Every structure is written in structure tokens, then in C-alpha cells.
Amino acid sequence: SIYVGNLSYD
């Protein structure tokens, strides 16, 4: 559920 820029992690 974590978004960094245009990337997503869970």
C-alpha cells in the first residue's frame, strides 16, 4: 500500500 513516485509497494 506504499506509493513512491510511479512505483507501488503493497
Swiss-Prot record:
**Domain of life assignment:** Bacteria
Recorded GO molecular functions are: RNA binding
The RRM domain is annotated at 1-10
| Keywords for the protein's UniProt record, in alphabetical order | RNA-binding
Write down what this protein is called. Putative RNA-binding protein RbpA
**Originating species:** Anabaena sp. (strain L31)
Taxonomic path: Bacteria, Bacillati, Cyanobacteriota, Cyanophyceae, Nostocales
